[in-house]
């Protein structure tokens, strides 16, 4: 998903 990708960066 997209949110998961962002959460990984954070």
Curated annotation (Swiss-Prot):
Protein modification: The C-terminal amidation is crucial for activity, since the carboxylated peptide has antimicrobial and mast cell degranulation activities drastically reduced compared to amidated peptide. However, the carboxylated peptide has no hemolytic activity, like the amidated peptide.
Effect of residue 5 to K: Decrease in antimicrobial activity, but no change in hemolytic activity. In R5K/T8W; In R5K/T8W; Increase in antimicrobial activity and gain in hemolytic activity (EC(50)=130 uM)
Outcome (variant: residue 8 to K): Increase in antimicrobial activity and gain of low hemolytic activity
Effect seen on changing residue 4 to A: Decrease in antimicrobial activity against S.aureus and better against E.coli and no change in hemolytic activity
GO biological process: defense response to bacterium; defense response to fungus; killing of cells of another organism
Effect of residue 8 to A/F/I/L: Increase in antimicrobial activity and gain in hemolytic activity
Leucine amide modifications at: 10
Effect of residue 5 to A/I/L: Increase in antimicrobial activity and gain in hemolytic activity
Primary location group: secreted
Keyword Nucleotide-binding found: no
Outcome of mutating residue 10 to A: Decrease in antimicrobial activity, but no change in hemolytic activity
Effect of residue 7 to A: Increase in antimicrobial activity and gain in hemolytic activity
Domain of life of the native organism: Eukaryota
Gene Ontology cellular-component terms listed: extracellular region
Compartment(s) where it occurs, according to its Swiss-Prot or TrEMBL record: Secreted
Reported effect, residue 2 to A: Decrease in antimicrobial activity, but no change in hemolytic activity
Tissues and organs where the protein is expressed, per its UniProt entry: Expressed by the venom gland.
Keywords, alphabetical: Amidation, Antibiotic, Antimicrobial, Fungicide, Secreted
Task performed by this protein: Antimicrobial peptide that exhibits broad-spectrum antimicrobial activity against both Gram-positive and Gram-negative bacteria. Also shows antifungal activities. Exhibits potent activity in stimulating degranulation from rat peritoneal mast cells but not from RBL-2H3 cells. Has little or no hemolytic activity towards human erythrocytes.
Subunit structure: A n-merization is probable.
Protein name stated in the entry: Anoplin
Organism (species): Anoplius samariensis
């Amino acid at each position: 998903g997209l949110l998961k990708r962002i959460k990984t960066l954070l």
